[in-house]
Amino acid sequence: MVPDSDEARLFLASCGLELYVGNGDETPAPLDIVQQMSSAYVEPVVAVPRDTPNPVEELGRQWHGVAARQRLAAEDGRFLILLAGPGTSGRGWLCVKDSVGRDLPARLLEGNGSLEFIALSMDGKRICATSEEDDEYWVVYEEVPS
């Protein structure tokens, strides 16, 4: 998905995300962040068992809570996102604003077939992601090493 394309704009709009042109000033390469998040040392800040009632809804609540506490979104609400799927790191960051403000994993699951995504602050320093593990959904928070 080309970041500034009609395809990207329409898909993101269907998920309640507004696409903006332009990324953060010092944005790390997507592949670097994907590798950091794929490390064997990554641990969740929240793990939601799949047998929890409404686990995807709970994952959304937890992700939004962590993202808010860590000030992932800029003052104007924008953040960067990498969506799950083949070629993720090659597509680049998409600069978005969440016009709904809740249930982002569920909205992406419905539109993309996956609830996994990596979100990055506009300054490129804070990561908040979701992940599907064996019998849990994870919310992962990491800071980008300087």
Predicted feature locations:
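Structured alpha/beta or helical-core interaction and ligand-binding surfaces enriched in interleaved
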Residues: 1-136, 141-146
